[in-house]
Amino acid sequence: MIAKNIELNGLDPATRALDILYWKNHCIKQLESLLCATDSYCTADKAAQLRILSELVLPNLGPRPSNATGPSYLTRSGSPIMLSLNTTSSKNCVRYCWEILGATGASNDDPLAVQVAKDVVASLSATFRLSTKWSETLLSNFAVTPDQARQVINMLPEWIQGFVPEGMECDFPKRIPFAMTSFDLNGSNVAMKLYVNPRVKEILTGTPSSDLVWEFLRNLTPEMKPRAVDLLERFITDNSGPSAIELVGIDCVDDAHLSNARVKLYVHTMSSSFNTVKNYVTLGGAIWDEQTQKGLGILQSIWHLLLQEPEGISDNGFDKPVNDSSMLCQKLYFSFELRPGTDFPQVKTYVPTWNYLRTDGETIQNYEAIFRACDHPWGEDRTYGKIFQDAFGPATESRKKPIHCDASFLFTEETGVYQTLYFSPPIEGETEVQSNLVA
């Protein structure tokens, strides 16, 4: 299965081959290791997934670091791909998210890789026979022209400084990601999602991202229930402010399944207290059914471990400081999932683990304690630690950036505890990659 070739704009084939080889050695062994760890994929499934990664994803991660205009800002390590493990009591699976950079990455002609995103999404949609009704609407609503993208990049430092504590200077990124996609690996197939950053349009126009998103939601077909959108708009406006929406995500499905597809809004908070979690998960008390209460009870019992505080925390108002307060750091994230015809969104909690961890080794211990508390076998016999080491090397290894990125939690009666652990593969020098090839 090979997607339609994207125009390479005269790029040297030998250069492209080296770029793809670099990304292959950056993540393919790690992905294969995680696939094996889940015990959910047969030999044919694993081969199919590695082929999809090699043929559809690696060519679209941009140039290798030495040839790129700058790093990806998807992950802390600068990697354009984030691997993850999804776990429930009955099944584990692998997922990955990647910034859409095409062959050229962010370039002078396409500074935020907007046109690249349109081309790659169209190609993937054709390959997997997916509807483009929502994806085209999402991309067109938040896209900017190359000239506008250059304006956004010039405006970025001042815009970011407005979110940093007074008197502090932060290390400004050269750009912000515009579009990402993710693949849930289901057997030999993938379920695709598309994510677009509404902040690009916000920076350019001065219109808060939330206002832009509500307009997008209300014009989708099949339509979302007005009651559900109104409820979410009131809550986010009252609790998060007009610029809280970080990402808009959609399920990419065929036309027959569009009526059950999700739109996901991601918002951040500047507090990590469990009181904040309770407020967001219940939409200020609007959602208070038995399932929500049960999920909150489980989450509360492991909250200190997710915050990397194994000795416990003082109370539900405990607000853990981030590791580096000079950075633009959001303390928690929440996603609100809407489907056509539903009255309430489903809320998932995300912890940016990298903001709180001391070392990957300590985080492994905390995650294993979480698995034990949730009756998941990865908490026994140092199983999770072995999974991590097999994929990424010893946790004791000195790294500039941690490999653990984020963690998410959701509880439903159907799946039980649903957790996702996210990983940022370290960016290696090209001489290191060549050494690994020789070895």
Swiss-Prot record:
UniProt KW keywords: Transferase
GO MF: transferase activity, transferring alkyl or aryl (other than methyl) groups
InterPro entries tied to this protein: Aro_prenylTrfase, Aro_prenylTrfase_DMATS
Pfam families linked to this entry: Trp_DMAT (PF11991)
EC number: 2.5.1.-
Binding-site residues for substrate, renumbered to this chain: 95, 193, 262, 264, 266, 350
Pathway note: Secondary metabolite biosynthesis
One GO term (biological process): alkaloid metabolic process
CDD domains in the cross-refs: PT-DMATS_CymD
Enzyme's top EC category: transferase
Phenotype reported upon loss of the gene: Leads to the accumulation of paspaline and 13-desoxypaxilline, but also lolitriol and a small amount of lolitrem J.
Induction section of the entry: Expression is down-regulated when the stress-activated mitogen-activated protein kinase (sakA) is deleted.
Family per similarity comment: Belongs to the tryptophan dimethylallyltransferase family.
Function of the protein: Indole diterpene prenyltransferase; part of the gene cluster that mediates the biosynthesis of lolitrems, indole-diterpene mycotoxins that are potent tremorgens in mammals, and are synthesized by clavicipitaceous fungal endophytes in association with their grass hosts. The geranylgeranyl diphosphate (GGPP) synthase ltmG is proposed to catalyze the first step in lolitrem biosynthesis. LtmG catalyzes a series of iterative condensations of isopentenyl diphosphate (IPP) with dimethylallyl diphosphate (DMAPP), geranyl diphosphate (GPP), and farnesyl diphosphate (FPP), to form GGPP.
Protein name: Indole diterpene prenyltransferase ltmF
Lineage: Eukaryota, Fungi, Dikarya, Ascomycota, Pezizomycotina
